[in-house]
Structure formats: structure tokens, C-alpha cells
């Protein structure tokens, strides 16, 4: 299967290989419910806590940076 490079900019999609621009309508959709409030809980995707403390990483010096 061939890989296609696509560039996304606003409501336009252009295929880099063919230079063909397609226009898609931008439709805003909203839905309100007055009877029940829906609460979505974000999942962490089983991420583990970081191995390094953030303050420790900030305290490290990099001699190659300057």
C-alpha cells in the first residue's frame, strides 16, 4: 500500500503528489441535553508515572547547550 503525504490546512486537503486540492465544507455541530448531564472521564492509557523527578531534571546542567 502506497503512503501518501497529506497536508491539512483549515478546510482544505491537498495531496502533495498530485497537487489536487479538495474543498470540504466546515460544519459546526453542537448538541445540548437539558435532562441529563453527561460526564466523560479521561483515560490515562495506562501511562506510568515518570522515572525522573521534574525538579531533578531541571537541576541538571548541559554543557553543550550554551
Curated annotation (Swiss-Prot):
Induction: By coronalon. It comes from the Eukaryota. Expressed exclusively in flowers. It is found in: Plastid, Chloroplast. Signal peptide: none annotated. Residues 1-25 form a transit peptide. GO terms for cellular component: chloroplast. Keywords: Chloroplast, Plastid, Transit peptide. Belongs to the terpene synthase family. Tpsb subfamily. This is Putative inactive (E)-beta-ocimene synthase, chloroplastic. It comes from Arabidopsis thaliana (Mouse-ear cress).
Amino acid at each position: 500500500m502506497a503512503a501518501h503525504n497529506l497536508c491539512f490546512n483549515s478546510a482544505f486537503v491537498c495531496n502533495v503528489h498530485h497537487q489536487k486540492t479538495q474543498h470540504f465544507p466546515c460544519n459546526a455541530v453542537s448538541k445540548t441535553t437539558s435532562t441529563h448531564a453527561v460526564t466523560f472521564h479521561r483515560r490515562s492509557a495506562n501511562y506510568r508515572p515518570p522515572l525522573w523527578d521534574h525538579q531533578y531534571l531541571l537541576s541538571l546542567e548541559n554543557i553543550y547547550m550554551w
